[in-house]
Amino acid sequence: MDDTNVRVNSAKAWFLAARPKTLTGAAVPVMIGIACAVALHGAEVRWVPAVLCMLFALIMQIDANFVNDYFDFMKGTDDEQRLGPKRACSQGWITAPAMRFALLLTTAVACVVGLPLILYGGWEMILVGLACVVFCFLYTISLSYMGLGDVLVLVFFGLVPVSMTYWLVAPASPLFSIPLTVIGLSLACGLVIDTLLVVNNYRDIDNDRRTGKRTLIVKIGAKNGRRLYLWLGIAACIVNFLFCYLPAVWPWLLPLFYLPFHIATYREMVRIDKGAALNLVLGKTARNMFLYGLLTVAGQVLSLTMV
């Protein structure tokens, strides 16, 4: 959607603030968790919690975008030197009080959507939900400024959503019975999604240094940041391969077709090096991430049909 002629607090402003292009990062882990359940349990999967998990993830991603927009604006991080996509509060599209109300409202809606999951996972789901909400707020408010963002991405865009989605969608079983295959795929998913954060922070390294935001890329430097980006994608495929032990092995290797796209994007990242042109790399990284998710899901489904 065109970001010109945006009226304050209009529907167009809210659509842009929700940043719909980021929703794939929330959808992919849930897709993989559902696919794992289908591969291991076939027709026994429970589709109601699958839908609820997807809705919860998407709403929480929008909430995280609102939180990020609001608190970065209040901290002065989003100024005229920002290289990334335009933010609603800093552009004046949405007033700070309206954004504050919106982020609280979306948090409440996410909690309401997630509440029925207690029926499938027990009261433990309250703790999981609270952890997601705390992560949503603390990431922008403080943790991303301490270089902990990448660890949190591995946990809350990998281990938690994939494993919890699998556990809720699969037939009722103890929490600690989640197969190692699912744990491995959740870790691989987190590694791939972290490439998005790495290229985002790589693009913003100079601005983050200036504003005191100590991201991991600021700490390790641009050169090591590029290396980290490359090896995250490679490590994801290695982890994915190591945890493949279903009888139908070859479909589990489908995610390897992600690597050529990832390496090509890495080379473009090295070539561009600095500036707003890195937004092209960010877009291609998001594409690669979604491709990885689709390949992994396809591998799971094929493993069921080929056993």
Where do the PLM segments sit?
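Extended hydrophobic alpha-helices typical of membrane-associated regions
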Residues: 245-305
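Intramembrane alpha-helical segments
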Residues: 87-173
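Small-residue-rich segments of transmembrane alpha-helices in multi-pass membrane proteins
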Residues: 28-33, 152-166, 189, 217-222, ...
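Membrane-embedded alpha-helical segments that form the functional core of polytopic membrane enzymes
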Residues: 43-68, 126-137, 177-199
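Multi-pass membrane catalytic core of lipid/isoprenoid biosynthesis enzymes
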Residues: 80-120, 213-248, 286-287, 292
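Topogenic membrane-insertion module of multi-pass membrane proteins
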Residues: 1-48, 52, 56, 146-149
